Amino acid sequence: MKVYDLPDSHGHFGPYGGIFVAETLISALEDLRIQYERYRSDADFQAEFAHELKHYVGRPTPIYHAKRWSAQLGGAQILLKREDLNHTGAHKINNAMGQALLARRMGKSRVIAETGAGQHGVATATVAARYGMECVIYMGSVDVERQAANVYRMKLLGAEVIPVESGSRTLKDALNEAMRDWVTNVADTFYIIGTVAGPHPYPMMVRDFQAIIGREAITQMQEDYGRQPDALIACVGGGSNAIGLFYPYLDSSIRMIGVEAAGHGVETDQHAATLTKGRPGVLHGNRTYLIQDENGQIVETHSISAGLDYPGVGPEHAWLKDSGRAEYFGITDEQALEAFHALCHYEGIIPALESSHALAYAARLAPALTSDKLLLVNLSGRGDKDMPTVARASHITF
């Protein structure tokens, strides 16, 4: 019996979530909520979504047993949910596809998005091209520089990419600019938020579209292993890949571990470990944990991974932390790079730097467990986009 039923009708996960936006957006969000409530239980909408996930995105993604790496580490077996094998190379397309289908049904001709690592931008540009929609992507200028390949992909796909020069010039600033655009152009524009943050109904909607990850995993684990894993491990920036894996498992007793970016260490001010070091506040339309100073001002974050470099986190993760249902830990840049190289070496898989944080935690946990234990890691994306960053960190030029 399903007992977990959050958010409530106002978008709250306990004290988190909700709607904290300018008056000009209230009616747009209410319309979005009504339309989403209508279509989330609409058989035709769900059938089209399932069809697109299968025939365009390439789902289901397999679960792969990383045997050589598991043997090298000793202890538990590491299994990978291969979201890197989706069209466009990450989990982001699951949500972008769902929201694009909703936008079409709402009669919107233009989509906008924010992006950090560029994967959500690429996914949004991809579905916009698929459906013939105008597309504008907001991206912090720092991220434009470190994710140049993804910027070019977006442009190839027909999107206009607008570099954001304000603030720390990263994901939170891109989100601010996208919100401003939406306020101005709400009549014809649909804002495809890329993570489980923002005002209600976005955290719920993005979670629901990403929950295909966990639903597939439940079926695949039963078919391939005759049981479910002992722990689920996923990286957390905003937290959409993690909640996509966790949500279908929430009523079980399976251990859930979210892995944040500890950057140069949580004892420094150069990290993005929101749940580890932050405290509650309001940002981007919802109440959640934030990295802020004593005056409540958002502090600049750091991670080698552009997709984890965010000072907030999805409100559902804030609730899962407080309730004790999920645990959250930090992994440093250095530890993530080590896991990145290990997966390349032992398994012939180049992971995204975001996913490498989850892999690094699995590598720490596995040796402490017996060999009959199964750790399911969400390999949220592939690492092609991170080649320049990894090369720089390794003092290699090409």
Swiss-Prot record:
Pathway: Amino-acid biosynthesis; L-tryptophan biosynthesis; L-tryptophan from chorismate: step 5/5. The modification N6-(pyridoxal phosphate)lysine is found at K92. It comes from the Bacteria. The keyword tRNA-binding does not apply. Pfam families: PALP. Its EC number is 4.2.1.20. GO terms for cellular component: cytoplasm. InterPro entries: Trp_synth_b_CS, Trp_synth_beta, Trp_synth_beta/beta-like, TrpB-like_PALP, TrpB-like_PALP_sf. It is an enzyme of class 4 (lyase). It catalyses: (1S,2R)-1-C-(indol-3-yl)glycerol 3-phosphate + L-serine = D-glyceraldehyde 3-phosphate + L-tryptophan + H2O. Its cofactor is pyridoxal 5'-phosphate. One of its GO terms (molecular function) is tryptophan synthase activity. Keywords: Amino-acid biosynthesis, Aromatic amino acid biosynthesis, Lyase, Pyridoxal phosphate, Tryptophan biosynthesis. Belongs to the TrpB family. HAMAP family: Trp_synth_beta (MF_00133). The beta subunit is responsible for the synthesis of L-tryptophan from indole and L-serine. Tetramer of two alpha and two beta chains. This is Tryptophan synthase beta chain. The gene is trpB.
